[in-house]
């Protein structure tokens, strides 16, 4: 809910105090997930897979573009970011979060209902962002939607990610 609240704020209210809802929501999701992990029978190989998904997810959400522009900036000058993973699809975080939660099931016995619920809620959030919030709060987003697929990368997007 915090992440959705942050999106509504970006598109409609523009209140400075609500700009950090997304990163705070992400931290709370991580904490809720950590509380559900079973550390008694850890699978090392799946831990490595989970770690890889987590690192890429963190990069996609907080490292591939300016965190200040994405999560702090209040003016209407935010522009679409269409490089790297965002050349593959408009919401690469959805794919990596789903991969993370699936791998956490095998690594730490995270219950499947938790993994499915968090992944489904993330997909719903991305759908709302894509349809209602990002076109209102990120300049150039409508054009970006015409060029880059929602979730499933195309061969053109895969080629684009390797361009310098």
Regions found by a protein language model. Give the residues of each.
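Membrane-anchoring alpha-helices and their flanking helix-loop junctions
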Residues: 1-82, 96-164
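Conserved SAM-binding loop
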Residues: 87-90
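Active-site His/Glu-centered metal-binding helix of metallohydrolases
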Residues: 93
